[in-house]
Every structure is written in structure tokens, then in C-alpha cells.
Amino acid sequence: YLTFYPFDFAPGFWQQLANSIKNGQVAILDVVKAEILRGNDELKSWMNQLEIGKYIDHRAAPILQRYGEVLQHIQKNPVYKVAALTEWSRETVADPWLIAIAVSYNYTIITFEESNTGLSSRTPSKNAKIPDVAQTFGVKTEKLYYMMRELGLKLG
């Protein structure tokens, strides 16, 4: 967030995003909230003040099933090293949960992550990327500006 919209530079962005979260247009995943709250910065303060209209508990049955499928995909896919599975298997890592939820509820994931265009079984990667794994499950990923346009968020 500091790269694109620091709080002191774009307070209107954060207020509009808070409104979209309050009215349920943007869902908040408990694992993502927990990740943010582990920090000690303005984003943590902002998160603590939010009214969340659509809060998703990652332990819901359909999500747990999809989560297992996501991890199984990484485990069985020869383009990934064991390190990719080890990283994504940590419960505090939000990436596989985001994909599991997006599959379960037909959501779009907003991320700055880029696909790994060099994935190959000859040179497996230790890092799974959201866009690559999401695509396997038919989940759409988009950038922040897509979301801003969809929600009608304006700067200035």
C-alpha cells in the first residue's frame, strides 16, 4: 500500500475502500485481516477501525475442501518444488485461502502478483504465485485499478 496509496497521500482512496468494505462490495478474509494485524503501522490502525460488511471465516466447510484441492495441486504439479507446498501449507499464508474462497464463492482476487511465465517441470519453482494457481481453478485475478473502476473509486 505504501508504494501506490500511502494514507497521507491518498486518504480519499482509503475512505472509499472502507465504504466498499462496509457495504459488502469487498469481502475481508479472516486470514488476511490477521496478517495485517500482525503489522504495526497505519494499515493495522485502519483495519482495526473498519466496519466489515462481508467477513469470511476460512474454516467454512466448502472453503476447507477447496483449500485442500489447492494444496494438492501444488503438491502434484511438477512445476513446483516442495518448498512451494511448504510455504503455502502454513495456515497463516493467505494465498491458498484466497483461491479456495474465490473458487467457493466465484470471487475475483485483486493482487499485484504477476504470473511466473517461466514455470517448467525441468526447473521447478519454489514459489507458487496466485495468478498461476488461480488460473488452474478458473479463478479470475485482476489488478487494483480494475477493482477501483468496478467500484467507482476516484482519486481527487
Segments (PLM) and residue ranges:
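Active-site-proximal, substrate-binding regions of enzyme catalytic domains
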Residues: 1-107, 115-119, 135
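Acidic, PIN/NYN-like endoribonuclease modules and their adjacent C-terminal/linker elements
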Residues: 2, 115-156
